[in-house]
């Protein structure tokens, strides 16, 4: 097999992971499983993130502290493990609040006005 693509969903409406920590552990497990199924293949995580505002869904709680911790933990793990990651999203997307529930608009590292959320 010269190339392959795998798709696994981490936390749309927090449907798989009950917590921020669980989302990262799930992603790490999926990378291990993908490596086992396709040894030597380049792995790119094309979208991951954690919202900083909105309603909790079971044990998944959006918060500024949680979003920052998820970002830092993801980047540190990805660098240590040689994984390429596209973090979602650069900016909050205010228009998504209806279609994606009240968390949909709050996945950015910067707010909708371009101000950084984390210092």
PLM-predicted stretches and their roles:
Residues 56-66, 77-119:
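Aromatic-rich peripheral "rim/lid" segments of glycoside hydrolase catalytic domains that contact
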